[in-house]
Amino acid sequence: MNTYKKEGTIKGELVVDGDLILTGNLIVEKWIDVKGSIDCAGYSIKSGGFIKSGGFIKSGGFIKAGDSIKAGYSIEAGGFIKAGDSIEAGGFIKAGDSSGISAGLYITAKETVSCGLKVFAGIGLWREITDAEKTITCSKLEKGNVAYGLLKETGITPS
């Protein structure tokens, strides 16, 4: 799998057939679709649309998407994690010790969810949000408090 390095502001979308490593903060006007993993190398990543990774998404700063954030494995940020739509991870979701996690719709992780402050799910303002759409589903809420949404801990630890 090839590795691509990016930074700066991109008009349109960013599609990567491999891994993405940031060499500075990255802002993408539309969406980000990466077949491999996204390593922000201490920088922040922001998309006007969705952010999707086949592997992990790791940022030393914040992760922000106007639409959804989805990773085949983990989503980890040194700062906040914010999505206008849903947040989904095949592994864990972790925001920084002085930050929170916010989603317009649901938050789902096969493993743990953790942050230093608060978790908000289902705060979308564009229509009535159902209980299913404001659910935080994870094996365990490891750290942080649910400020808005319904917590559903599965207790299942992936092997």
Question: What is the role of each PLM region?
Answer:
Residues 1-33, 37-47, 62, 68, ...:
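Intrinsically disordered, low-complexity terminal regions
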